[in-house]
Amino acid sequence: MQVSVAEISGILKKQIAEYGKEAEVSEVGEVIAVGDGIARAYGLDNVMAGEMVEFEDGTQGMALNLEEDNVGIVIFGEGLAIKEGTTVKRTGRIVDVPVGKGLLGRVTDGLGNPIDDKGPLETTERRLAEVKAPGIIPRKSVHEPLHTGIKALDGLVPIGRGQRELIIGDRQTGKTAVAIDTIINQKRTHETDSPVYCIYVAIGQKRSTVAQVVQTLEENGAMAYTTVVAATASDPAPMQFLSAYTGCAMGEYYRDNGMHALIVYDDLSKQATAYRQMSLILRRPPGREAYPGDVFYIHSRLLERAAKMNDEHGGGSLTALPIIETQDGDVSAYIPTNVISITDGQIFLETDLFYSGIRPAISVGLSVSRVGGSAQVKATKQVAGTLRLDLAQYREMAAFAQFGSDLDATTQKLLHRGKRLMELLKQAQYAPLSMEEQVVSIFAGTRGFLDVVDADAVVKAELELLKQMHAKHSDLLDTIRTSGKLDADTETKLGVAITAIIKEFLA
């Protein structure tokens, strides 16, 4: 068999022409030390701060410490296969996460990867987890209400869209319950043209607790407009630290596209603890309470991203409800004072109130909303205007009344009314009230219609009142809802209706 030279050269030329494989160039370093979720690598000379890197077993990490001769990398995951000599390469991208409506109804980890066994996420858009907060010019002052469905809050500590309102209190005082109720109450907004989408970020919590929250949201039909980001207690500290920024990026998608979002960080105390752990292992100098010097900045740059945008920028909003856990009611500790100074007000929950049966255990005297007043619905403002003062006078007189039994008629009347108002502010969990229902309840309390009811029966009387209002006077409720205010005519009709219902209740 003879093979011609021309044939061979033709085959070779063809193969050379078709050979077009490009060599993949990547900057690779080598791990020189690893331990406690931190790896130090040598050779990644051009790595950026906050850049994602990948170890040879596929585990991801983030470059945090850029030193002269090595790079400190926090590891996302177990990292059991990472040892001295393991190669690590740059990815060239800063941490980014999936965003969009495809995340609604889903549960993700601290990096936005799904962990709910419902398949891949139906979203293509990604955003950087860490971005600069909007400047002063694109913002607008808070002026639209965000109803929580909780009488004590909407009446006394109103929250507006785009506000940052801190929920602070000891463990087991109902902080998460307030946040979950607020998420459940946003279901009403989905019947209007400006729905509020919700993100719940669980930081350092037990998996069983997160599962319980997801189940509660599903049972109340709230998962349809909610995304849960969970970095649980068993996740590495870097994941717990990053999860808040991941959730925030998801919320910013709605804010920047002219929609409204609510984000709950539960809780930032555990995020600060995770950051302290990372910083100490990275040998950063410790400051007060062993937290690093920039612990204020990690919370301020996160919470400043909650904003109400002006109309030229779409008019969207991102409202933040950060949660802080105190030790024995000490709000003057480092992290609580930091977050109080960053936020636009705080809801203070007290253990004593909780155990005395006043739930939600909101301390009316210590809770404030610095910007929410301008977002409050006029009807609520009209009926709840005197409520804070009435309660303050009641608390003062109640303390005074312990010392003596001889009280004048005015004081006795004040104590009598105050007791009923305290009872009126009680509310069952997962039972948020609409704005018009709250107006009716508070109106009945502050205008003295409930003075004839025994203090123990106030909660029952209120339930009956709302039930009868829906059954017989739904037109009045509709008027309050549509107009958003109480005119003289509506007030008179409401007074007559409430008097009749209470009379029937007492009969």
Swiss-Prot record:
Cross-referenced HAMAP family: ATP_synth_alpha_bact
UniProt protein name: ATP synthase subunit alpha
Site residues (Required for activity), renumbered to this chain: 367
SUPFAM superfamilies: C-terminal domain of alpha and beta subunits of F1 ATP synthase, N-terminal domain of alpha and beta subunits of F1 ATP synthase, P-loop containing nucleoside triphosphate hydrolases
The protein's assembly and partners: F-type ATPases have 2 components, CF(1) - the catalytic core - and CF(0) - the membrane proton channel. CF(1) has five subunits: alpha(3), beta(3), gamma(1), delta(1), epsilon(1). CF(0) has three main subunits: a(1), b(2) and c(9-12). The alpha and beta chains form an alternating ring which encloses part of the gamma chain. CF(1) is attached to CF(0) by a central stalk formed by the gamma and epsilon chains, while a peripheral stalk is formed by the delta and b chains.
Positions bound to ATP: 169-176
Catalytic activity, EC: 7.1.2.2
The protein's role, per its UniProt record: Produces ATP from ADP in the presence of a proton gradient across the membrane. The alpha chain is a regulatory subunit.
Assigned GO CC terms: plasma membrane; proton-transporting ATP synthase complex
Membrane topology recorded in Swiss-Prot or TrEMBL: Peripheral membrane protein
Family: Belongs to the ATPase alpha/beta chains family.
Gene3D superfamilies in the record: 2.40.30.20, ATP synthase alpha/beta chain, C-terminal domain, P-loop containing nucleotide triphosphate hydrolases
Keyword hit for Ribonucleoprotein: no
Catalyzed reactions: ATP + H2O + 4 H(+)(in) = ADP + phosphate + 5 H(+)(out)
Keywords for the protein's UniProt record, in alphabetical order: ATP synthesis, ATP-binding, Cell inner membrane, Cell membrane, CF(1), Hydrogen ion transport, Ion transport, Membrane, Nucleotide-binding, Translocase, Transport
Sample GO molecular function, one term: proton-transporting ATP synthase activity, rotational mechanism
Intracellular or extracellular location(s): Cell inner membrane
